[in-house]
Swiss-Prot record:
<feature type="binding site">
    <location>
        <position position="98"/>
    </location>
    <ligand>
        <name>heme b</name>
    </ligand>
</feature>
<keyword id="KW-0944">Nitration</keyword>
<dbReference type="InterPro" id="IPR001032">
    <property type="entry name" value="Leghaemoglobin-like"/>
</dbReference>
<dbReference type="GO" id="GO:0020037">
    <property type="term" value="F:heme binding"/>
</dbReference>
<keyword id="KW-0963">Cytoplasm</keyword>
<keyword id="KW-0539">Nucleus</keyword>
<keyword id="KW-0479">Metal-binding</keyword>
<dbReference type="InterPro" id="IPR019824">
    <property type="entry name" value="Leghaemoglobin_Fe_BS"/>
</dbReference>
<keyword id="KW-0536">Nodulation</keyword>
<dbReference type="InterPro" id="IPR012292">
    <property type="entry name" value="Globin/Proto"/>
</dbReference>
<dbReference type="GO" id="GO:0009877">
    <property type="term" value="P:nodulation"/>
</dbReference>
<dbReference type="GO" id="GO:0005829">
    <property type="term" value="C:cytosol"/>
</dbReference>
<keyword id="KW-0561">Oxygen transport</keyword>
<feature type="modified residue" description="Phosphoserine">
    <location>
        <position position="45"/>
    </location>
</feature>
<dbReference type="GO" id="GO:0046872">
    <property type="term" value="F:metal ion binding"/>
</dbReference>
<keyword id="KW-0349">Heme</keyword>
<keyword id="KW-0535">Nitrogen fixation</keyword>
């Protein structure tokens, strides 16, 4: 069964919850990443020279919004066509340049889900989590393909 209209709606609703507190949720997202993979700090220009995760950093917030937005867009693509195609072909080369490996995708996925769970609060469910996981997996597969 393909990605459903309901799954897309769940992703869209929780994405809006995430954006309601973009500064706080961005810090939370990168805190979760660094908690699991401290060495990943050097992969992000806005983190590599900072102590911990900087508060109110426009670059950090823009990158978090881009990551979550790409996953949300992937949900829309999966619903419409059943496949994720990168709108920005340079995503593969950027990830190669930064030294991103398969385990990094797992860390980011876990951080994304934990952040969304915090943002969504009582509306979070296994169904919401599953919708985001499917969309994220579609996006990560497209990025990995572009990396090879």
């Amino acid at each position: 069964m393909g990605f459903t209209e309901k799954q897309e709606a769940l992703v869209n609703a929780s994405y809006e919850a995430f954006k309601q507190n973009l500064p706080g949720n961005s810090v939370l997202f990168y805190s979760f990443i660094l908690e699991k993979a401290p060495a990943a700090k050097g992969m992000f220009s806005f983190l590599k020279d900072s102590d911990g995760v900087p508060q109110n950093n426009p670059s950090l917030q823009a990158h978090a919004e881009k990551v979550f937005g790409l996953v949300r867009d992937s949900a829309a693509q999966l619903r419409a066509t059943g496949v994720v195609v990168l709108a920005d072909a340079s995503l593969g080369s950027v990830h190669v340049q930064k030294g991103v490996l398969d385990p990094h995708f797992v860390v980011v996925k876990e951080a994304l889900l934990k952040t969304l769970k915090e943002a969504a609060g009582a509306t979070w469910s296994d169904e919401v989590s599953n919708a985001w996981e499917v969309a994220y997996d579609g996006l990560s597969a497209a990025i990995k393909k572009a990396m090879s």
